[in-house]
């Protein structure tokens, strides 16, 4: 009888232990992943992924945040609050140099800026003596424009540059002919063409950059960065996430109307009617980091020669590139 009681007690203890283990497993919380991206082409590129918010890997809960201003995005990254972010390519370098805790994992968009004019010009060489409007003095669109101008045999002093804070400010300027020539990105370019159908799209900065540098892709405009300490322990998730980003971009390019609907639902500021018309020239493309290391190195070298502060004080070393 005693033996039987002992056996029952042992069995009860074992069951209790197993139940305890099971409860602990059940109570294990999902890993929360914060993905931050700016309002504009990067959030358009990830719109399918953000709208569906699909389960990328069991045990992870992904939160997508669209930052409405560049300052908000910069603050989020520099405070290391984002596990994954899509940022301007120069901000990727700054984040690495300043925090040592972010790595470049891929590209979601190449150069989407265009030289447009109400005047009859054929290219960058024809800009001598003209006034050209652009966004952000000393920022990457300005530096890239000046690099292309110099490569076309002109001095930046040959051109009278005027600057505005955002691409949205360029649209009324050109549409009302307060400025006749400008460097305009998508999707603002599509909005401009609706207001001024006669505007001439003269050159793509990305295509011009490709010719000058002999690059296969052009210059990286939007970059996916991942937090290093998060990547170290969650590599499988990140690799799966990058595959989903690629699929999202393919879908967006192939289904502009649906992409416009998704963007509206996730809070992208651009109207869906503008989005679906802008995708043809938006240059959204996923390029894995292993395919674009040379492009980043070359672009950072160009930026550093104009203003080393634009990339955080120095060209990042090899550790900036994420390894799968």
Per-segment meaning from a language model:
Residues 17-20:
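C-terminal motif of bacterial Sec signal peptides marking the signal peptidase cleavage site
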Residues 1-9:
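Bacterial N-terminal signal peptides that target proteins for export
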Residues 22-24:
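Bacterial signal peptide processing site
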Residues 297, 301-324:
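Conserved C-terminal helix/tail region of periplasmic/extracytoplasmic solute-binding proteins
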Residues 53-60, 206-217, 284-292:
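Short, solvent-exposed loop/beta-turn-alpha elements that line the ligand-binding surface or hinge
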Residues 89-91, 169-262:
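Pocket-lining segment of extracytoplasmic ligand-binding domains
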């Amino acid at each position: 009888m005693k033996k039987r009681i002992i056996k029952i007690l042992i069995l009860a203890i074992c069951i209790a232990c197993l139940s305890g283990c099971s409860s602990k497993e059940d109570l294990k919380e999902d890993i929360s992943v914060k993905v931050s991206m700016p309002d504009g082409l990067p959030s358009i590129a990830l719109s399918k992924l953000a709208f569906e918010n699909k389960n990328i890997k069991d045990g992870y809960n992904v939160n997508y945040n669209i930052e409405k201003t560049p300052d908000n995005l910069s603050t989020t990254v520099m405070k290391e609050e984002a596990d994954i972010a899509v940022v301007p390519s120069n901000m990727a370098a700054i984040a690495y140099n300043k925090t040592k805790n972010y790595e470049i994992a891929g590209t979601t968009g190449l150069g989407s800026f265009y030289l447009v004019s109400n005047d009859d010009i054929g290219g960058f060489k024809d800009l001598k003596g003209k006034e050209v409007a652009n966004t952000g003095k000393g920022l990457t669109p300005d530096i890239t424009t000046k690099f292309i101008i110099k490569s076309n045999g002109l001095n930046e002093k040959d051109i009278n540059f005027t600057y505005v804070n955002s691409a949205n400010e360029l649209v009324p300027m050109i549409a009302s002919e307060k400025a006749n020539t400008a460097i305009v990105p998508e999707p603002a370019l599509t909005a401009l063409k609706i207001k001024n159908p006669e505007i001439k799209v003269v050159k793509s900065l990305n295509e011009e950059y490709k010719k000058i540098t002999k690059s296969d892709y052009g210059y990286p405009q939007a970059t996916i960065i991942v937090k290093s300490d998060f990547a170290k322990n969650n590599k499988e998730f990140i690799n799966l996430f990058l595959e989903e980003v690629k699929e999202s971009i393919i879908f967006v390019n192939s289904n502009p109307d649906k992409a416009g609907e998704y963007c509206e639902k996730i809070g992208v500021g651009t109207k869906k009617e503008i989005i679906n018309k802008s995708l043809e020239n938006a240059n959204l493309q996923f390029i894995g980091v292993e395919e674009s290391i040379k492009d980043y190195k070359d672009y950072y070298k160009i930026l550093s020669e104009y203003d080393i502060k634009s990339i955080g004080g120095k060209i990042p070393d090899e550790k900036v590139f994420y390894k799968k």
